[in-house]
């Protein structure tokens, strides 16, 4: 099975995984897909896939591991998620594949599919482990990618893809503060923080 089968499924409307199972059970290709021959497969729109991983692009794509402290995925028209073990509280070990979720964006035109993917990536909130999201956002906005003039050397020859700030985790910090005040009756002030540091 092709790794990017979701892209093919989105533009053809054929569930490739289901078709393979049906064919293995003895159905014909026509019975499994609803298409009598190849000429009946009509391509509709454009799709692209992104693999969100726990790899750190600024550190030679070394996989990160640890506990996912927050996880919110993207949704919306034209967005398909094929997930793994990505959820708040999930533990990513060094012995596990770094893939968290595959995101496929479909739209009538390539530029709209790219815009949908960019929006979806901006909706993700993953905390506790490093991810490649900011790197992929840079890639999707890069003029060479948008002009469809990239080659297999694109990443190696485009250092500005790696220029991004790590996302700040303001939401979790605020929630931790509220929990400390509510549950532990702790109220941090600058004086209290100085005393605590010693």
Residue positions per predicted region:
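Single conserved hydrophobic/aromatic residue that forms the stacking wall/gate
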Residues: 188-198
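Catalytic cores of soluble metabolic enzymes centered on carboxylation/carboxyl-transfer
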Residues: 2-190
């Amino acid at each position: 099975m092709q790794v990017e089968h979701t892209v093919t499924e989105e533009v053809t409307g054929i569930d490739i995984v289901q078709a393979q199972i049906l064919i293995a059970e003895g159905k014909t290709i026509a019975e499994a897909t609803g298409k009598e021959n190849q000429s009946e497969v009509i391509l509709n729109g454009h799709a692209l896939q992104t693999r969100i991983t726990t790899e750190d692009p600024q550190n030679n794509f070394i996989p990160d591991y640890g506990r996912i402290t927050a996880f919110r995925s993207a949704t919306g028209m034209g967005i398909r998620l094929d997930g793994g073990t990505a959820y708040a509280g999930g533990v990513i070990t060094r012995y596990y594949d770094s893939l968290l979720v595959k995101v496929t964006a479909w739209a009538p035109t390539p530029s709209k599919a790219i815009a949908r993917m960019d929006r979806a990536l901006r909706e993700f909130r993953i905390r506790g482990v490093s991810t490649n999201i900011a790197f992929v956002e840079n890639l999707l906005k890069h003029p060479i990618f948008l002009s469809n003039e990239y080659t297999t050397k694109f990443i190696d020859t485009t250092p500005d893809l790696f220029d991004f700030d790590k996302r700040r985790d303001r939401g979790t910090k605020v929630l931790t503060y509220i929990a400390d005040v509510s549950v532990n009756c702790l109220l941090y002030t600058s004086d209290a923080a100085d005393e605590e540091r010693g």
